[in-house]
């Protein structure tokens, strides 16, 4: 927010003139009660002992100096035990409109150089279609990539294909047994096979293309079924994600880790750290020394790799490719996996802030108030494709992003389909459409709004509601920064909901097109146009469209 930077710059100069240093624990934020000002700062309380004075007296001195040297400050006063509360002038807040007009689509973006980020998300086993839980992870991961790019980071996105484990062998077996069943052969079903209709569809397609398939030896038949099933399912996943406006820049195969020597390279890196050892013909990683609850096997006595070994190799490979911040989006059921992966990152010699995990909690899908049961293996789940078809990509993404990702989410399908202000995504999109409608009507009535507003055009913006809307629009930059810092995309949806609420309230209280007051009309049109730009920019972070009419 320009207000925070303005206050920080002015106050830092005052503190330096006093022979003091800017306190690292300084907090500049809006006071709880907006009647107490636009911003409150605690510097005086942090510096009082060093300045050998009373915190409140120091706050009073800071307030007086701010009024003297900062023309944008309309009011500054000491409050409480030593806060300094600051109110900016209306002219200062009106400048928000010109800031937004100048930046356009780039409004809210950071100009600071960022980090090289590798963001891995979804990465569902290609054993079946994506379900709504995967959809939430997809929405969070894709929007997080958009958010981090806004914050100045260079973000590469990947989908890790688990194509080398037991689940894939079980997938091939499940399709093979369906092929035999469709051919009238006797079949003994294992307890944990995949039962969905999609398995039957793949088996039927294979049998139609090759009627002699059931006569093949089981190992060869299972391999063919595995290859066909994985290819079909993975293509379906890619199609679903494309429909959901989700793009992964690379699809990384687990199998390639062994083929390219990435596993050996990772083991060598861990060996240099002194945390690996051999015991009982197995290769171990001493994660207990690094905060895990026990040591972990990487290579079993039969020579096969554990899942953990592959994951370590994959993360080591990411660092080797030059990325300095790895972010994984995992299901909440993987929470216990974080300490051992952090141990591996530490053993590689990387800093703690080089690895973060965003957890995705369960989605409780509701239809007519009743929960929809989901089980991938039983084939009784609601797919992401089904949800997109029923409620649309916009509603699905916004709903998935409406709560903190590590909190369970109730997804009400009926609510998501409503074309009313009770529907959260409709509420925000309608704010944008409403602004566009006003601008169209204004043009039809002959009001000509210049591309860039000047101080004279904006001067009629002088009501309390004008200032409230301006302050909220100005807060967009800080909100994006805080959301990126915390990896919390839900902050964006919450902000947009609040901004839309202020816009709807403003529209209800104030007539925008005034036949007898052209100057005020143009000022309000400029205000609404800038708010519309902020709504568009925010919806873009969420991967949600901003319709011009609804």
UniProtKB/Swiss-Prot annotation:
It catalyses: tRNA(Arg) + L-arginine + ATP = L-arginyl-tRNA(Arg) + AMP + diphosphate. A motif ('HIGH' region) lies at residues 124-134. One of its GO terms (molecular function) is ATP binding. InterPro entries: aa-tRNA-synth_I_CS, Arg-tRNA-ligase, Arg-tRNA-synth_N, Arg-tRNA-synth_N_sf, ArgRS_core, DALR_anticod-bd, Rossmann-like_a/b/a_fold, tRNAsynth_Ia_anticodon-bd. Pfam families: Arg_tRNA_synt_N, DALR_1, tRNA-synt_1d. Its EC number is 6.1.1.19. It is found in: Cytoplasm. Belongs to the class-I aminoacyl-tRNA synthetase family. Monomer. This is Arginine--tRNA ligase. It comes from Desulfovibrio desulfuricans (strain ATCC 27774 / DSM 6949 / MB).
